[in-house]
């Protein structure tokens, strides 16, 4: 299935690229979420008319993500959790908890933007957590977990 990308898609291409994908990926993900359109003559002409508008929207999203990344770079978030004598938490700190703490600190962050490659946090300590704000913009935040 040949499609025209309407935005940058990870591991696939950039805005305006013509790509060949499997039919299921196109029908079930790219087309319904507005990330692509079918590559025919009418859609190609319509895309070329809207290209400047789409590029401006993509640049605005990236600029917004970069400003949020600059705010996050200065932040250090402290999360209090109940823990045992040896520093092991009763429960865990996940992406939702970190996103809530960052939002409370004044920077709007969605749960899906927080990346914990080693899984949830289960020990008291300091952690560097990646926040994926845009396909080209990633920030690192220091999260300090203390025992209550």
Swiss-Prot record:
The gene is rplI. PROSITE patterns: RIBOSOMAL_L9. One of its GO terms (molecular function) is rRNA binding. Belongs to the bacterial ribosomal protein bL9 family. GO terms for cellular component: ribonucleoprotein complex; ribosome. This is Large ribosomal subunit protein bL9. The keyword DNA damage does not apply. InterPro entries: Ribosomal_bL9, Ribosomal_bL9/RNase_H1_N, Ribosomal_bL9_bac/chp, Ribosomal_bL9_C, Ribosomal_bL9_C_sf, Ribosomal_bL9_N, Ribosomal_bL9_N_sf. Pfam families: Ribosomal_L9_C (PF03948), Ribosomal_L9_N (PF01281). Keywords: Ribonucleoprotein, Ribosomal protein, RNA-binding, rRNA-binding. One of its GO terms (biological process) is translation. Binds to the 23S rRNA.
């Amino acid at each position: 299935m040949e499609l025209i990308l309407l935005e940058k898609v990870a591991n696939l291409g950039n805005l305006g690229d013509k790509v060949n994908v499997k039919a299921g990926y196109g029908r079930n993900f790219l087309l319904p979420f507005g990330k692509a359109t079918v590559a025919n003559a009418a859609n190609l002409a319509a895309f070329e008319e809207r290209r400047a508008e789409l590029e401006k929207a993509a640049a605005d999203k990236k600029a917004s993500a970069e400003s949020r990344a600059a705010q996050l770079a200065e932040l250090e978030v402290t999360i209090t959790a109940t823990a045992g004598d040896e520093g092991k938490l009763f429960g865990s700190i996940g992406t939702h908890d970190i996103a809530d703490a960052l939002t409370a600190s004044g920077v709007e962050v969605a749960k899906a933007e927080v990346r914990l490659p080693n899984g949830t946090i289960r020990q008291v300590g300091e952690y560097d957590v990646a926040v994926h704000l845009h396909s080209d913009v990633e920030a690192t935040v220091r999260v300090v977990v203390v025992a209550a």
